[in-house]
Amino acid sequence: MKLAAIHHVAIIVSDYEKAREFYVNKLGFAVVRENFRKNRNDWKLDLRVGDGADAIELEIFAEPNPPERVNRPEACGLRHLAFRVEDVEATVEELVQMGIECEPIRLDSYTKKKMTFFFDPDGLPLELHE
């Protein structure tokens, strides 16, 4: 078996409008599909970031009362989403101007590249990495 690539990552959010604003209007994801699922009385939002072979889709499912995410101590499962950027410092400046707090920039001990973390509206850790 040979897997070609990651096709998409799916996340559950507690506030659909807040998540849509964050991922589309602040982080710049493109909307691929937006569907109201009548049988579940909720929305599903498919987003894309990147081009060609570097593109990845993010599926957002709205759940009005999901259990809280366990961040500390870390639990099994998805730890964080990481995004490659050309310039971590410039990207952090843009995020801060939009009111998004970022952790201090540091060097990844393995790649020796600059990196930092910030969080989505539900507390999902997001990483920027050069």
Feature map (PLM): residue ranges:
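Mid-chain, well-packed structural core segment of small domains
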Residues: 71-77, 81-89
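N-terminal beta-strand motif that seeds the catalytic metal site of vicinal oxygen chelate
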Residues: 1-18, 78-83
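Exposed loop/turn and edge beta-strand positions of beta-sandwich/beta-sheet ligand-binding modules
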Residues: 5, 41-43, 77, 112
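Generic preference for hydrophobic
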Residues: 58-60, 128
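Vicinal oxygen chelate
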Residues: 1-2, 46, 92-130
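Core segments of cupin and vicinal oxygen chelate
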Residues: 12-55, 97
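A short, acidic/glycine-rich surface segment
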Residues: 32-33, 42-43, 65-71, 104
